Regions:
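Conserved N-terminal subdomain of the carbohydrate kinase-like
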Residues: 1-87, 235-243
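Short beta-strands and strand-loop turn motifs
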Residues: 44-47, 74-82, 108-117, 148, ...
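Conserved phosphate/ATP/ADP-binding segment of small-molecule kinases
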Residues: 87-170
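Short, charged, surface-exposed loops that flank catalytic or proteolytic processing sites
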Residues: 121-130, 198-209
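Short pre-catalytic strand/loop immediately N-terminal to key active-site residues, enriched for Gly-Thr
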Residues: 170-183
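Short, small-residue alpha-helix embedded
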Residues: 180-203
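Charged C-terminal helix
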Residues: 204-247
Length: 247
């Protein structure tokens, strides 16, 4: 069962104009403490977009309240893309996000986020040896596993590059690249990965599943001319998940 701890309620996703947003920062810690008082035990905590430094700090505290020694801590440091921070974040925001990253078992930045977290100048054309150096530097913050998303493996292939510092081991996996962009693919990837981990898959197998399932969802979505506005139509691809899990 999923237990949702909302940080905000939006009338639509951020590609829509003039959306309404209700900030729920003040409720994060009270909800976490209430769950703790009711002896709620979590197998995993997965965090995504956080709208302010205060939210990041409160989620760090919520992890301390909710996570036990065996709880998976999965952090998607969603704050930037294309070489720039998202609108509303100042240049100090990555410093706050680094505190949350330090608590993670698995962290899944894109290249922009990895560069911001490590103080590395952003470039789109880093080769694999340089990307490995960035992951090593990011691992110094404290996460057990670092997964770089959106890694190009040639003009027709896109995937992930993962690093486990305790073993000084890298893992590469790519799948077919599709020339399309939809909101929510990062959330979809992370959710599929967490789900696979909760089903007992090792991280490398979970990453393969997440990459392949995200590709399937994009392929399905490309058939719908209205899809770019509403996001990835993952519901139509859910029937493929049992097959992916059994591989």
């Amino acid at each position: 069962e999923c237990a949702i701890l909302p940080t905000a309620v939006l009338s639509a996703h951020t590609m829509f104009p003039d959306i309404l947003c209700r900030d729920l920062t003040a409720d994060i810690l009270p909800i976490a403490r209430y769950w703790r008082s009711q002896q709620v035990q979590l197998d995993a905590v997965y965090t995504g977009y956080l709208a302010s430094p205060r939210q990041v700090e409160d989620v760090c505290q919520a992890l301390e309240v909710l996570a036990g020694p065996d709880t998976l801590r999965f952090v998607d440091p969603a704050m930037a893309d294309g070489g720039a921070l998202y609108t509303g974040f100042d240049e100090d925001f990555p410093r706050h996000m680094a505190r949350l990253v330090a608590q993670a078992d698995v962290v899944t930045p894109n290249l922009t986020e990895a560069c911001l977290l490590t103080g590395t100048p952003y470039r789109e054309d880093y080769d694999l040896p340089r990307l490995r150096d960035i992951l090593r530097k990011l691992a110094e913050l404290g996460p057990r596993h670092v997964v770089l998303t959106g890694v190009p493996y040639g003009p027709d292939k896109l995937g992930v590059l993962a690093y486990t510092p305790a073993e000084d081991r890298f893992f590469e996996y790519g799948s077919r690249r599709i020339d399309a962009h939809f909101p929510g693919t990062g959330d979809l990837f992370s959710s599929a990965c967490v789900g696979a981990l909760m089903r007992g898959k090792p991280l490398e197998e979970a990453l393969r599943l997440a990459v392949d399932f995200t590709l399937l969802c994009i392929q399905v979505t490309c058939r719908d001319e209205n899809a770019p506005w509403y996001g990835v139509e993952f519901e139509k691809a859910l029937r493929y998940l049992p097959e992916l899990l059994e591989r």
